[in-house]
Amino acid sequence: MSKRDYYEVLGLSKGASKDEIKKAYRRLAKKYHPDVSKEENAIEKFKEVQEAYEVLSDDQKRAQYDQFGHAGANQGFGGFGGGGDFGGGFGFEDIFSSFFGGGGGRRRDPNAPRQGADLQYQVTLEFEEAIFGKELNVEIPVEDPCDTCKGSGAKPGTSKETCKHCSGSGQVSVEQNTPFGRIVNRQACSHCSGTGQMIKEKCTTCHGSGKVRKRKKINVKIPAGIDNGQQIRVSGKGEAGVNGGPXGDLYVVVHVRSHEFFEREGDHIICEMPLTFAQMALGAEVEVPTVHGKVKLKIPAGTQTGTEFRLKGKGAPNVRGYGQGDQYVVVRVVVPTKLTSHQKDLLREFAGQEEQDDSLFGKLKRAFKGE
């Protein structure tokens, strides 16, 4: 299933301002948050809104998304948050605090489903591998539900008990003296961490956490035409969710090794081709390396050093599937450092014959200097 456009997710046009993006996110996050929404697919919608906001609220990520779409949306994405929240730097409490002045809004249900943490994996590709794409089997460390206790954290054959300190509510009342008098606040129970349940006998495998550290093998398809610094999102391959929530995502960040002959500029490939003075002066047909194999290139007589030739369709494929780049060949004259006596005599004879024509002689000197 293809991903929806991020602007469409937030109900915005492509030219939306940062303030409009933030307002749209706050409205939709409040609407779809699992603690509030009764819609069946609220978790997925909240996750979709969160993902769109994370990209469009960041100038660099937004520019990458506008240029490359979902394939390049997260270029340069930094570290990822922990698995105990829906990630993203603008939480549900922020939404309510903006309406109620902070602290007085509804608290998150600790037993509500929560998305698992996102993971990041760095991979280095050869120049040609990035051009043509490849499949990789990567091994990443993840926290998965404990097989022994099925993720409950309790010893098999036992179950969690209702917390006696909060009577299973997950919250306790705390009185505070303020300049306005004594007030009573509700806060998370410290004994059960707000869950309302206690583990009397912990699982000996996971020690009550309900999770164990494992190494998981994941197949990752690198699309043809991916460039250095771009990343691939593998949905649902991050950390396991909490309380039945969806798993996080895996982000594979691509690094491409430099090539000794080719350079890349977007979908185009650039190279320099050394030629002799005779080839450029008299014309020649030469073989030029490309990532697709060698091709023949005709050099017209009188070609000047620095001249650029275009090999159509010999560049990198567009990572979004929009055609193929070209290869540009820049020719450079190579001045010989060692000459035989015969070669020197021929050059002196040539120089003597053409010395009367200052313009031609000047061109010759500039050609040998590589200007």
Swiss-Prot record:
One of its GO terms (biological process) is chaperone cofactor-dependent protein refolding. It comes from the Bacteria. Its cofactor is Zn(2+). Pfam families: DnaJ (PF00226), DnaJ_C (PF01556), DnaJ_CXXCXGXG (PF00684). Its main location: cytoplasm. The J domain is necessary and sufficient to stimulate DnaK ATPase activity. Zinc center 1 plays an important role in the autonomous, DnaK-independent chaperone activity of DnaJ. Zinc center 2 is essential for interaction with DnaK and for DnaJ activity. PANTHER family: CHAPERONE PROTEIN DNAJ, DNAJ HOMOLOG 1, MITOCHONDRIAL-RELATED. This is Chaperone protein DnaJ. It comes from Bacillus cereus (strain AH820).
